[in-house]
C-alpha cells in the first residue's frame, strides 16, 4: 500500500538491489508496481558491493537485473547501473562530513549514482498554469496550530492566505491556508510537484481524510460515478 502511494507520485526511481544476493522476489514486485503506476524512469544501485569478492559475480547480478527490467518492459539494456556500498559511504561521511568524491571511493560511488539520476531521469513538465489541485495523503493535528494535510501538488500553485475548497467524500468545505511546509522548511508558496504540508484554518482533523482533495474554489466538482481502468496484482 505505501509503495503504491509513493510510487504513483514519482518522476523517477532508484532501484536498490543487493550485489551480494541479486534480485529478490520483492524486487520484482517493486519493478511491477513501478511499471503499473507509471514511474517513467529507473536507475539501479547495486548495494553491498564490498561483500562481493569476485567481480564476475557482480556482473552476473547486473545481467540478472537487466533481464528482470526487460521482463517488465523497462529498457533494461540501457538503464544505468552503479555499484557501491551505502554503509561504507555513510561511515566515511560520519567520520568526516567534508569527505567528497575524491576523498573516499565509496562516497564517489554515491556521487556517480546521483550523476546517473541527473543525466538519465528527465526533468518533468509541471502543470503550473492550471488551477491548484492537491490530493490529500495524510492528515495530522498539531497542538496550538491546527490541522495539516499532506500530499503532492498535482497542478497549479498555492500560497499562504489563499482560500481553497476541500472536495470529496463529504460536503465541500471552504478553508484558508495559514501555513506551508516542505521537508521542515517553511514556505510562502508551493507549486506542482512539491510534496507539502498545508496548514488549514478552522478545520478539524476529523473533517478531512485521505482521498479528499484541496482545490481552487470552483475549479472541480465531486462525482459519485466514474469509469476506471483497474490493475489486479497477484503473486
Curated annotation (Swiss-Prot):
InterPro entries per the UniProt record, alphabetical: EF-Tu_GTPase, EFTu-like_2, EFTU_2, P-loop_NTPase, T_Tr_GTP-bd_dom, Transl_B-barrel_sf
Enzyme class: hydrolase
EC number: 3.6.5.3
Residues that coordinate or bind GTP: 47-50
A GO biological-process term: mitochondrial translational elongation
Cited PROSITE patterns: G_TR_2 (PS51722)
Claim: Chloroplast is one of the keywords in the record: yes
GO annotation, cellular component aspect: chloroplast; mitochondrion
Function: GTP hydrolase that promotes the GTP-dependent binding of aminoacyl-tRNA to the A-site of ribosomes during protein biosynthesis.
Entry similarity comment: Belongs to the TRAFAC class translation factor GTPase superfamily. Classic translation factor GTPase family. EF-Tu/EF-1A subfamily.
Name of protein: Elongation factor Tu, chloroplastic
Native source species: Bryopsis plumosa (Green alga)
Recorded name of the encoding gene: tufA
